[in-house]
Curated annotation (Swiss-Prot):
Stated name of the protein: Alkaline phosphatase 4
Signal peptide coordinates: 1-41
Domain of life from the UniProt record: Bacteria
Binding site for Mg(2+): D58, T161, E282
C-alpha cells in the first residue's frame, strides 16, 4: 500500500471537518431563518389592524372542505395531502343557533345579523333584534370610524347575508326595501357602502324606482360586466352582473366576474383610504347548490370561494395590517363524505363535470338529446339506465326533473350522502389570518365574531 503524501493526509483530515462546518453553518442559518420568520410573524400579530375582511362561505360546513381537499388530490387520500387554502389558517369552530322561539337552526338572515351585529335574532330578521329594533353592524361602525366599506356576493347583493351588514329590515323577503336602504341610509352624511358588487339588477332597476340612476347621480360608477369592472378605477362603484344571483362558477360566461375578480376589485378601491376599510365577501351559492343536494355545484362554488380567499390572504400578507376571517354562517344539506353503508367517497365523478346539473338540465329542456348533453358536459360513461332516468324525469318535470335526475347520477357515482334540503345545526369552522387572529381560537359563538371586530375597529387591536 502506498504511503499518503503530506497533502493527501491533511486533505483527508480536513474534509470531514469542512463537512461538519458546512452542516453546522447550515443548521445555524436555518435556525436563524426560523427565528426571523417567527419574529416577523410575532411582529405582524402585534401590528395595528387597519383593515378587516370577513369572508362567508354560505352553508360551507366541514364536509365541504374535506370533499374539496380530496378533489385537490385527484380523489386520492395520501398521508400528506395537498391542503386547501383554508386548512392553513384553521383557528376554531363557531356555534350558529338563532334566538327564535320556533327554530333552533338558523337561516342566513339571523346568522348574518349575528355575525354582523353581535346580536342573535329570529330567522328572517335583517339587522334587527328579536323585538324588531335596529342594531348597529360592524360595517356601520367602520364607516363611522372614517373607513371605506364594501359588500361582495355571488347572490343578489341585497340577499340575506350582505343585507345583514348593510341594512335593517324585519324580513329578508323585503328585497326592494333593502336595495332602497343602500341608497337612502347615510352615516355622517355619506352613503355607508362604497363598493357593492354582486347580482340583483332587477331590484335596482324597477318601475317604481331606478336605483342605478340614483347611484350614478350620487357619484358612483355603475358596471355590469367583468371587463367594465376591471377597466373602472373609481373608489365608489355599484356592480350588478345578473338580474338575480350570478350563474354558478362552473357555468359562468366570460362577461361575468368570478368571486376573486370582485374581491380583488373591491380591495383595490377600498385600500385607497388611509384610515382603512371593512369588506364582507360571500360565496353565496355553496348554500344554493346544497339546498339542491348538488355535489357538483357545491364543489364548484367552494373552489370559487377558495380563489377569492387566497387573493385576500395574499393582500393581507403584503399589507401586514389586515385581518382576514373566513367562516360559514351555517352548514346546509347534511352533506356526508360517504353513504349507503360504504366506507368510500369518490371524487372522480365530480371532477369529471364540465357544467353543473342545472346547466345540463336547461339544455335538455331546450330540446337537446339527453345522451348528447351528458356526453358533452359530464365526461362519464353513462349507462342506458341513467339516460332513461333523466329522460323520464325531464318528461315529468322538464328542467327541474332533469336536474334532480342528473344530480342523483353524480351523488350515486361519488357516494355522496345528503340528509336534508335545508340548513343543519352543527358548528362551522373559522379560519383567521393576520394580526388579531388569535382572538378567534377555540369554540366561539357567531356573535363573538362581531363583538371582536367591533373592538378592533375602535382600537386597532
Amino acid at each position: 500500500m502506498k504511503k499518503m503524501s503530506l497533502f493527501q493526509n491533511m486533505k483527508s483530515k480536513l474534509l470531514p471537518i469542512a463537512a461538519v462546518s458546512v452542516l453546522t453553518a447550515g443548521i445555524f442559518a436555518g435556525a436563524e431563518l426560523q427565528q426571523t420568520e417567527k419574529a416577523s410573524a410575532k411582529k405582524q400579530d402585534k401590528a395595528e389592524i387597519r383593515n378587516v375582511i370577513v369572508m362567508i362561505g354560505d352553508g360551507m360546513g366541514t364536509p365541504y372542505i374535506r370533499a374539496y381537499r380530496s378533489m385537490k388530490n385527484n380523489g386520492d387520500t395520501p398521508n400528506n395531502p395537498k391542503l386547501t387554502e383554508f386548512d392553513r389558517n384553521l383557528t376554531g369552530m363557531m356555534m350558529t343557533h338563532p334566538d327564535d322561539p320556533d327554530y333552533n337552526i338558523t337561516d342566513s338572515a339571523a346568522a348574518g345579523t349575528a355575525l354582523a351585529t353581535g346580536v342573535k335574532t329570529y330567522n328572517n330578521a335583517i339587522g334587527v333584534d328579536k323585538n324588531g329594533k335596529k342594531v348597529k353592524s360592524v360595517l356601520e361602525e367602520a364607516k363611522q370610524q372614517g373607513k371605506s366599506t364594501g359588500l361582495v356576493a355571488t347572490s343578489e347583493i341585497n340577499h340575506a347575508t350582505p343585507a345583514a351588514y348593510g341594512a335593517h329590515n324585519e324580513s329578508r323577503k323585503n328585497m326592494d326595501q333593502i336595495a332602497n336602504s343602500y341608497m337612502d341610509d347615510k352615516i355622517k352624511g355619506k352613503h355607508k357602502i362604497d363598493v357593492l358588487l354582486g347580482g340583483g339588477k332587477s331590484y335596482f332597476n324597477r318601475k317604481d324606482r331606478n336605483l342605478t340612476k340614483e347611484f350614478k347621480q350620487a357619484g358612483y360608477s355603475y358596471v355590469t360586466t367583468k371587463q367594465a369592472l376591471k377597466k373602472n378605477k373609481d373608489q365608489q362603484v355599484l356592480g350588478l352582473f345578473a338580474d338575480g344571483g350570478l350563474a354558478k362558477a362552473l357555468d359562468r360566461d366570460s362577461k361575468t366576474p368570478s368571486l376573486k375578480d370582485m374581491t380583488v376589485s373591491a380591495i383595490d378601491r377600498l385600500n385607497q383610504n388611509k384610515k382603512g376599510f371593512f369588506l364582507m365577501v360571500e360565496g353565496s351559492q355553496i348554500d344554493w347548490a346544497a339546498h339542491d343536494n348538488d355535489t357538483v355545484g357545491a364543489m364548484s362554488e367552494v373552489k370559487d370561494f377558495e380563489q377569492a380567499y387566497k387573493a385576500a390572504i395574499e393582500f393581507a400578507k403584503k399589507d401586514k395590517h389586515t385581518l382576514v376571517i373566513a367562516t360559514a354562517d351555517h352548514t346546509t344539506g347534511g352533506f356526508t363524505i360517504g353513504a349507503n353503508g360504504e366506507k368510500n367517497w369518490h371524487a372522480e365523478p365530480i371532477l369529471s363535470a364540465k357544467k353543473t346539473p342545472e346547466f345540463m338540465a336547461k339544455k335538455i329542456s331546450e330540446g337537446k338529446p339527453v345522451k348528447d348533453v351528458l356526453a358533452r358536459y359530464a365526461n362519464l360513461k353513462v349507462t342506458s339506465e341513467e339516460i332513461k332516468s333523466v329522460e323520464a324525469a325531464a318528461q315529468a318535470d322538464k328542467s327541474k326533473g332533469a336536474s334532480k335526475a342528473i344530480i342523483k347520477i353524480f351523488n350515486t357515482r361519488s357516494n355522496s350522502g345528503w340528509t336534508s334540503t335545508d340548513h343543519t345545526g352543527e358548528e362551522v369552522p373559522v379560519y383567521a389570518y393576520g394580526p388579531g387572529k388569535e382572538k378567534f381560537r377555540g369554540l366561539i359563538n357567531n356573535t363573538d365574531q362581531a363583538n371582536i371586530i367591533f373592538k378592533i375597529l375602535k382600537t386597532g387591536k
